[in-house]
């Protein structure tokens, strides 16, 4: 099938690769504009999807706006039968959604209608979900509200981070996408409307989510740490006299009567901190200001922490 692909980050690369490998004619790729990088912001970094497209000699288009008619004109010239969107990062206007004869479909990294929005993987982990998945849906005017074509679920590991789940779902989504496209091409795709009563949202993440509140349970904080990777990263200024970023934690399963925020142990295994409801969280990887990410044990060699210090 003649397909126009729209995507930007690493998550979308397996989907593009899968379409090419399946023998579809990818007539073009839309990706967000290159971003300036470097100390002086004087170098342009192409998106992962752009790099993938160029490696396959696929024409790349990077419109700044989607509503000024330029993007639509480019699409009409390319004349795709279907548009496939995977983490493009732009909202498509109705005239683009209705342009290809077989419509537009999207690879969404949640089990819709749960977690509509920009950060579904992160919120699934932050909220302590044990199952996630991907959805292939027909795109509609309302964000992430279109009919479901296919879904596949996967368990979230107890210590799996959002960053790790992101990589797994990108592969799962690519495989499911190829199946869905084949069904659409054969006229066999089933469309299931979303249940509006089950909708939950996954808004963009912000730095305001980073601070750790030690009155919460160890499990809730463990989910926060895992869910805020790779950005904005959980942090605390209550333990060491400086704000540290927390990258890896463990639920010890221990119990304590100490006040939340109390450092119970600091050594080779990490930093054990009292949390809400008498639970204990162990910090095993962190980053101090101006330093690289490191094991908590390595940090402690140069920054000893007094055990039983209070919040």
Regions from the language model: what does each represent?
Residues 1-40:
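N-terminal Rossmann-like dinucleotide-binding module
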Residues 22-25, 82-201, 208:
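Donor/substrate-binding cores of folate-linked one-carbon enzymes
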Residues 8-11, 64-67, 88-90, 252:
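Short beta->alpha connector loops
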Residues 215-311:
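An anion-binding loop in the catalytic cleft
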Residues 36-79:
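N-terminal glycine-/serine-/threonine-rich beta1-alpha1-beta2 phosphate-ribose binding loop
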Residues 203-216:
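Acyl-group handling in specialized metabolite and lipid biosynthesis
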Residues 7, 29, 53, 83, ...:
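A residue-level signal for conserved active-site and pocket-lining positions in enzyme catalytic cores
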């Amino acid at each position: 099938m003649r397909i126009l692909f729209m995507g930007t980050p690493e998550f979308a690369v397996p989907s593009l690769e899968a379409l090419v490998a399946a023998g579809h004619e990818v007539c073009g790729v839309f990706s967000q504009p290159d971003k300036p990088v470097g100390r002086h912001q004087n170098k342009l970094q192409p998106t992962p999807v752009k790099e993938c497209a160029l490696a396959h000699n696929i024409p790349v288009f990077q419109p700044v706006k989607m509503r000024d008619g330029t993007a639509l004109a480019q699409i009409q010239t390319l004349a795709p039968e279907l548009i496939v969107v995977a983490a493009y990062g732009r909202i498509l206007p109705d005239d683009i959604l209705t342009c290809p004869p077989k419509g537009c479909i999207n690879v969404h990294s949640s089990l819709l209608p749960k977690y509509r929005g920009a950060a579904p993987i992160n919120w699934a982990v932050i909220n302590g979900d044990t199952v996630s998945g991907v959805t292939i849906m027909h795109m509609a005017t309302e964000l992430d509200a279109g009919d479901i074509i296919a879904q596949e679920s996967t368990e979230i590991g107890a210590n799996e981070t959002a960053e790790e789940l992101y990589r797994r779902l990108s592969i799962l989504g690519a495989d499911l996408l190829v199946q869905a496209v084949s069904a659409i091409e054969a006229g066999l795709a089933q469309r299931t409307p979303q249940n509006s009563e089950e909708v939950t949202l996954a808004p963009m993440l912000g730095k305001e989510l980073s601070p750790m509140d030690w009155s919460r349970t160890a499990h809730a904080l463990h989910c926060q740490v895992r869910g805020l990777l790779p950005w904005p990263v959980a942090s605390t200024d209550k333990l060491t006299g400086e704000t540290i970023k927390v990258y890896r934690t463990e639920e010890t399963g221990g119990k304590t009567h100490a006040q939340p925020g109390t450092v119970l142990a600091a050594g080779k295994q990490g930093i054990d901190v009292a949390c809400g409801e008498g639970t204990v969280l162990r910090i095993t990887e962190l980053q101090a200001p101006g330093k690289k990410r490191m094991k908590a044990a390595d940090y402690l060699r140069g920054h000893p922490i007094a055990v039983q210090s209070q919040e």
